[in-house]
Amino acid sequence: ERRAERESQMRADEEFGSQVQYLTQQRRARLPWRREGRSFDEEFRELRNVDEEERRDMMIE
C-alpha cells in the first residue's frame, strides 16, 4: 500500500514537473531574450508571477 502511495506521488511529481517544463517552454517562446543564464528557480518564480498576473487580469475583465 505504501509503495502504491509512493508511486502515485512520483507520478504526480513527474506530471507537475512536465507541466512546469511545458509552461517554461511556452514562456520562453514568448520571451526569447530572457532565456540566457536563468536558473530554474528564477523561471519558476516568474511563471508563478505570470499566473498571478493573468488571474488578476481575468478578474479585472
Curated annotation (Swiss-Prot):
The lineage of its organism: Eukaryota, Viridiplantae, Streptophyta, Embryophyta, Tracheophyta. Disulfide bonds: none annotated. Belongs to the 2S seed storage albumins family. This is 2S seed storage albumin protein. Keywords: Disulfide bond, Protein synthesis inhibitor, Seed storage protein, Storage protein. IC(50) of translation-inhibiting activity is 17 uM (small chain) and 300 nM (large chain). GO terms for molecular function: nutrient reservoir activity. It comes from the Eukaryota. The mature protein consists of a small and a large chain linked by 2 disulfide bonds. One of its GO terms (biological process) is negative regulation of translation. This is a 2S seed storage protein. Inhibits cell-free protein synthesis.
